[in-house]
């Protein structure tokens, strides 16, 4: 996969906690990279009979769409504001350390059912707060969380380990071991 080279050549280390990938993943999107990401997640979860891909707006939508296309299944994204038109919904609170704020996310109950087999996808996994919030939506619906696909896991922030220890299957395409000294260090 060319993703590793793209990240090594284009990602910007902002601090020892923050990696910026907005030139190809979460601001300006390279569709070829997104298709490759979606196809790789589909390959890893192809035999799991996924019925829906779940993500969070906005950064997860492109990743979710290409994954859903490759799996030939619907994409459902959690909304960060509960619109008045949403009706009966599952709701979860998520704290963002990057933005230093809490956000309420929601999914309409009519789109997340107890017989669903869910694959959650997102761009980053750091402390795991977004994933915990999305998993909480799945649990409220009594649906099955089959696994999680992450483009970039900041392994040094511990979210992935905690979720794996809790029994969640996580497939990360890239694992960052450190951003110390302004340098990107990847796990092999």
Swiss-Prot record:
<dbReference type="GO" id="GO:0046110">
    <property type="term" value="P:xanthine metabolic process"/>
</dbReference>
<comment type="function">
    <text>Converts the preformed base xanthine, a product of nucleic acid breakdown, to xanthosine 5'-monophosphate (XMP), so it can be reused for RNA or DNA synthesis.</text>
</comment>
<comment type="subunit">
    <text>Homodimer.</text>
</comment>
<dbReference type="GO" id="GO:0006166">
    <property type="term" value="P:purine ribonucleoside salvage"/>
</dbReference>
<dbReference type="InterPro" id="IPR050118">
    <property type="entry name" value="Pur/Pyrimidine_PRTase"/>
</dbReference>
<dbReference type="GO" id="GO:0005737">
    <property type="term" value="C:cytoplasm"/>
</dbReference>
<dbReference type="Pfam" id="PF00156">
    <property type="entry name" value="Pribosyltran"/>
</dbReference>
<comment type="similarity">
    <text>Belongs to the purine/pyrimidine phosphoribosyltransferase family. Xpt subfamily.</text>
</comment>
<feature type="binding site">
    <location>
        <position position="19"/>
    </location>
    <ligand>
        <name>xanthine</name>
    </ligand>
</feature>
<dbReference type="InterPro" id="IPR000836">
    <property type="entry name" value="PRibTrfase_dom"/>
</dbReference>
<feature type="binding site">
    <location>
        <position position="26"/>
    </location>
    <ligand>
        <name>xanthine</name>
    </ligand>
</feature>
<keyword id="KW-0808">Transferase</keyword>
<keyword id="KW-0963">Cytoplasm</keyword>
<dbReference type="GO" id="GO:0000310">
    <property type="term" value="F:xanthine phosphoribosyltransferase activity"/>
</dbReference>
<protein>
    <recommendedName>
        <fullName>Xanthine phosphoribosyltransferase</fullName>
        <ecNumber>2.4.2.22</ecNumber>
    </recommendedName>
</protein>
<dbReference type="InterPro" id="IPR029057">
    <property type="entry name" value="PRTase-like"/>
</dbReference>
<keyword id="KW-0328">Glycosyltransferase</keyword>
<feature type="binding site">
    <location>
        <begin position="126"/>
        <end position="130"/>
    </location>
    <ligand>
        <name>5-phospho-alpha-D-ribose 1-diphosphate</name>
    </ligand>
</feature>
<dbReference type="GO" id="GO:0032265">
    <property type="term" value="P:XMP salvage"/>
</dbReference>
<feature type="binding site">
    <location>
        <position position="154"/>
    </location>
    <ligand>
        <name>xanthine</name>
    </ligand>
</feature>
<dbReference type="InterPro" id="IPR010079">
    <property type="entry name" value="Xanthine_PRibTrfase"/>
</dbReference>
<comment type="pathway">
    <text>Purine metabolism; XMP biosynthesis via salvage pathway; XMP from xanthine: step 1/1.</text>
</comment>
<keyword id="KW-0660">Purine salvage</keyword>
